[in-house]
From Swiss-Prot:
KW Magnesium (keyword) present: no
Keyword Transport set for record: no
Main location, first listed in the record: cytoplasm
Free-text function comment from the UniProt entry: Single strand-specific metallo-endoribonuclease involved in late-stage 70S ribosome quality control and in maturation of the 3' terminus of the 16S rRNA.
One GO BP annotation of this record: rRNA processing
Family of this protein: Belongs to the endoribonuclease YbeY family.
Transmembrane segments: none
Any GO MF annotation of the entry: RNA endonuclease activity
InterPro entries recorded: MetalPrtase_cat_dom_sf_prd, YbeY, YbeY_CS
Name by which UniProt lists this protein: Endoribonuclease YbeY
Species name: Treponema pallidum (strain Nichols)
Gene: ybeY
Enzyme class: hydrolase
Subcellular location: Cytoplasm
């Protein structure tokens, strides 16, 4: 049985694509597979311009990136008295995801899942020194991706 998690998904800079409804169930499946429960987090799909501004404001880097994670670390109880951890926000540039998918010769939906998982791992407290494949966090990211490779695999318009 699935643990309780709350995931909100929104778009900034464009209308929500038809597949956007698949994102929250995918995130919940990843959280469940990692025994993470009672998280409340948000996913924002955006443009390069939007994420570039955030990257500059919060990291001093004046260029777009594929994913940013912002921890919140708060807690609250819902009306039923269930305690939730405010994990934070995962911001994903769909333009950068598409560019990455072309550069690494993978499907766009695979790269989108990869950056979602990457953001979840950052919010769970993991980090990496660089992007070399030997990094513990990146090895775990790829194992989780392989475990969930069939989820969120259809209906994404930039799939080739």
């Amino acid at each position: 049985m699935s643990e309780v998690n709350k995931v909100s998904v929104s778009c900034e800079g464009f209308c929500p694509p038809p597949w956007i409804g698949q994102v929250a169930p995918f995130v919940c499946a990843v959280l469940d597979s990692q025994a993470i429960s009672h998280w409340d987090l948000s996913i924002v799909c955006c443009t390069d311009a939007f994420i570039r501004r955030l990257n500059y404001d919060y990291r001093g880097i004046d260029s777009p990136t594929d994913v940013l994670s912002f921890e919140n670390d708060g807690e609250y109880c819902d009306d039923a008295g269930t305690r939730f951890f405010l994990a934070g926000d995962i911001i994903i540039s769909l333009e950068s995801v598409r560019e990455n998918s072309e550069r690494f010769h993978v499907a766009a939906h695979e790269e989108f899942k990869r950056v979602l998982i990457h953001g979840i791992l950052h919010l769970s407290g993991m980090d990496h020194q660089d992007n070399s494949p030997g990094q513990e966090m990146l090895r775990l990211q790829e194992r989780i991706l392989a475990q969930h490779c069939r989820v969120l695999s259809s209906g994404i318009p930039w799939e080739s």
